[in-house]
Curated annotation (Swiss-Prot):
It comes from Mus musculus (Mouse). Its main location: cytoplasm. One of its GO terms (cellular component) is cytoplasmic vesicle. InterPro entries: Rab-GAP-TBC_dom, Rab-GAP_TBC_sf. Residues 282-488 form the Rab-GAP TBC domain. This is TBC1 domain family member 25. The gene is Tbc1d25. The modification Phosphoserine is found at residues 194, 560. GO terms for molecular function: GTPase activator activity.
Amino acid sequence: MRPPAQARWEGQGPTAPLRLRSGARWGRGRPHCWVYVRVRVTIGYHLDRDDSGGMATTSAASDSACSAAPPPVGGAQAAAAVEEEEREVVRVRVKKCESFLSPEFRSFAVDPQITSLDVLQHILIRAFDLNGKKNFGISYLARDRLGQETFLSLLSDWDLSTAFATASKPYLQLRVDIRPSEDSPLLEDWDIISPKDVIGSDVLLAEKRSSLTTAALPFTQSILSQVGRTLSKVQQVLSWSYGEDVKPFKPPLSDAEFHTYLNHEGQLSRPEELRLRIYHGGVEPSLRKVVWRYLLNVYPDGLTGRERMDYMKRKSREYEQLKSEWAQRVNPEDLEFIRSTVLKDVLRTDRAHPYYAGPEDGPHLRALHDLLTTYAVTHPQVSYCQGMSDLASPILAVMDHEGHAFVCFCGIMKRLAANFHPDGRAMATKFAHLKLLLRHADPDFYQYLQEAGADDLFFCYRWLLLELKREFAFDDALRMLEVTWSSLPPDPPEHEVELVGPPSQVADTGFGSHRGRPVRQRHMLRPAGGGGGAFEDAVVHLAASSQGPSGGGRLLRQASLDGLQQLRDNMGLRKDHLVQLSHPATLISSKSLSEPLLNSPDPLLSTSSRPDSPSSSSPPSTQEASPSGDIAVGSPLMQEVGSPRDPGKPVPPPPPMGLPPPQEFGRGNPFMLFLCLAILLEHRDHIMRNGLDYNELAMHFDRLVRKHHLGRVLRRAKALFADYLQSEVWDSEEGAEATAPS
């Protein structure tokens, strides 16, 4: 009996798809035969890695053939063998992304005919050692109908077959995103639940406290708390002088060191010292998930580790409930308007970062959209304003959990909601204080800006509104934010973080509405004389109010650069003064919301437009802006800003004046002002040497978006902040009371 012309056996394993093939040829009436066996082994992964960011190109596939008297093969058979070889091998390149850790790369080859999604997952687990991180997503690089590259999720064997068929030439590019699950111990593995976890921590307590005292940088909340503390106690930690900026930063707070700030029950026992430590060097990326909740005042005081875990789970369930109530809280028209407005900003927020890369309907972008929509629906007095997506984006990326991120976002918005109020008072105060600080720190530079017509500092609007989030690369911005938050005093909620805001008050919004139907208005500041489209795309005011079933109004505002006009009004800028500073503008209003929401691709990103140069002239406007007396601090600056000057006369040097105390300065966030000052001073010489006018100066800083050097800015800001705290040049009755001996 003759054997078959070709025998074939296939075996399948989790990491090594295997195919063996044997063939035999028999000659009629001839006593000899030849048999050949071809063995192909495809190993599931290749351990070479390319840490520089490139893909390793060496394949782990190997072929071996053993033959005894191989059969003759013709040219057609050879071509068929090559074609079959191409069908049997798909080269794969994989990039693993895990939070903010450096990406890892692997390269291997698989047989598409016998490689299922389950087999591929086993290969990736072995390749990247993912045994403890089973919750990960796989996506492959493909091209959409327009030819744009995008990552598509691999959710089934059918998806994998499609990837092999359409996206494997010359190789299949995969991305693995690690996502810890909600109940994974990775979320809270640094929370102490058992006392045995902190054995020996008391031994380190005295040593840690001593080292913090001797090397401490200025710490704001030591002043802000005002509970039985005097300035002399604050000065005990001010051991770093202005000239010592060459000292390196302390290393980021580690997991082990964080445990020393907790007691035997896992409660945070030294919140002030923890913030001071973070002010020194930031937090390790793997620790941010928990530490940021303290910095954003999410946890009530005194929670143990187990109580914190239960608290976050409960608040997450509360968020999911609120998310399901959108339709009950707003009418369909307003809800659709809110969602579309939020979506336009979400789709352009941090898309270059791996966490938000991928298709527009990706899970992270969808989570950011739902988070912001829920906030707008549940906080009608604030609603949604452009820029909020920039504040929520880093929080969601760090928490990697939609519900937890929403709780933290509510925590930070408790402090920053005033930035987005339509009356512009909060932003006007911050501008006034930054102007006062620059005038105090560098009179010559301030005088130069006055002569250039740039002393209003409106090109810094994005800095103050978003607390400099866009001025640094994403990872640097995370560190800058946590250092800034650590300079603020602890303010834990008395009971829990409130996830629902007060109802809307239409009378307080400053916008009218027609009875019985929504009224939406769009306001733009445009130059009176065609000076380059001053605020044409950069300043958009959008309002929407409607009467809901309960009779309460609802307001949605877009593009917070609209606050520039309110800032001018609140800061007492008269129109004749605006003309001399080349700020002629007319207000164009009552445009329908059916028009595009934003003309600029990213209004907050560009503030370089200016109506005219300082040398141009415009007829004075007859329309007066009513000044506001709402700024409580820095009245000398307000008097100086509100009065016109003769452009032909030299600007006299400003007289020395004090600065507000920390609890008032920058509306309670003074360190943010010093960061802004540090950025200005970093570029002072370049600006003055090249004689930049307002437009050139604003464009200069627009080009530096996400490019500022965090190390230099932090060192300079901390040194200036130390001088401020030591100088006691505080001009406020409250400040005088705070510095009085107790």
